[in-house]
């Protein structure tokens, strides 16, 4: 039996978000729908999830002592990481002391960097992956590239949104690629992964839920990347029945090996009927924002339902749908959005994240659309996103 308390009362059920961006904001909203008390934590003030939380704290989440202090102050029943850059060793300690880390501290630590999850997938689970080598010096990096061959990709073992990533076609790029990788890591300079380039027809995110009533799959989400970050996503991505079966089997093995209850974003390459594992996030995925309009239960609702110990039951997908990011480039601490009336309509929505500032290029919102076909849904979402005029 699952018992939920009432927020701001002695018996409240308390959830602490570690990372309070746009994904955490939607998780907070889903917690609020169930009367759960939300504490939002991030490295900067006025982060999106803080707008809809009961309380918030600004700390360096890579500082284990600071993390322990805020946990001891708030005494959450669930600690829900939204990002990779967290003191995961402290999360393991806290879990050993009886706290509930979502989905579990081991999953958070393994997926914090690409080495942990790649070794689990390729070496322990024997899943198909790209060829890869790890390196922690420039000389070993050059050896890894020589071993893998051209073209290849170098990434910091801990980064997101394409930061520090270079597609390497020739030896002339090596010095700059190493330097860029050292600048792009979320926890500073360090180890990198060199990967062989995989031949694929398309990439998918298979949103996979591990819950008290078993493992559940959303329809596959297709997406387009640019500069290492997603620009559009759509659902469902068409693929052969055999490829879908293989994708689900890979995802099932990964989430069960990681353990715990919650939603996982499993990234896969698909080439014909063949499926290759890429990465996994033990939390809602940015490409999954399309589920805000495409499903009866969004990825955020599914995550909350699962980690609270509630059954998922089933997931209803409504048909062709898409998301397109609102990605302006400017510098401002007082952003406004004009022409919004032309970005909404029947089966057409937007989400504006409420980020407090922008300095360069930053994702500030997303347009969501449904249509008779995926192609039409993508075009509707892109058009709507383009209608929003961001000023500052």
Curated annotation (Swiss-Prot):
Residues 119-308 form the ATP-grasp domain. PROSITE patterns: ATP_GRASP (PS50975). The modification N6-acetyllysine is found at residue 179. It catalyses: N(1)-(5-phospho-beta-D-ribosyl)glycinamide + formate + ATP = N(2)-formyl-N(1)-(5-phospho-beta-D-ribosyl)glycinamide + ADP + phosphate + H(+); acetate + ATP = acetyl phosphate + ADP; carbamate + ATP = carbamoyl phosphate + ADP. It comes from the Bacteria. N(1)-(5-phospho-beta-D-ribosyl)glycinamide binds at residues 22-23, 82, 286, 355, 362-363. InterPro entries: ATP-grasp, ATP-grasp_carboxylate-amine, ATP_grasp_subdomain_1, PreATP-grasp_dom_sf, PurT, PurT/PurK_preATP-grasp, PurT_C, Rudment_hybrid_motif. Mg(2+) binds at residues 267, 279. One of its GO terms (molecular function) is ATP binding. Disruption phenotype: Mutant defective in both purN and purT requires an exogenous purine source for growth. ATP binds at residues 114, 155, 160-165, 195-198, 203. Keywords: Acetylation, ATP-binding, Ligase, Magnesium, Metal-binding, Nucleotide-binding, Purine biosynthesis. Gene3D superfamilies: 3.40.50.20, ATP-grasp fold, A domain, ATP-grasp fold, B domain. NCBIfam families: PRK09288.1, purT. Homodimer. Involved in the de novo purine biosynthesis. Catalyzes the transfer of formate to 5-phospho-ribosyl-glycinamide (GAR), producing 5-phospho-ribosyl-N-formylglycinamide (FGAR). Formate is provided by PurU via hydrolysis of 10-formyl-tetrahydrofolate. PurT is also able to cleave acetyl phosphate and carbamoyl phosphate to produce ATP with acetate and carbamate, respectively. This is Formate-dependent phosphoribosylglycinamide formyltransferase. The lineage of its organism: Bacteria, Pseudomonadati, Pseudomonadota, Gammaproteobacteria, Enterobacterales.
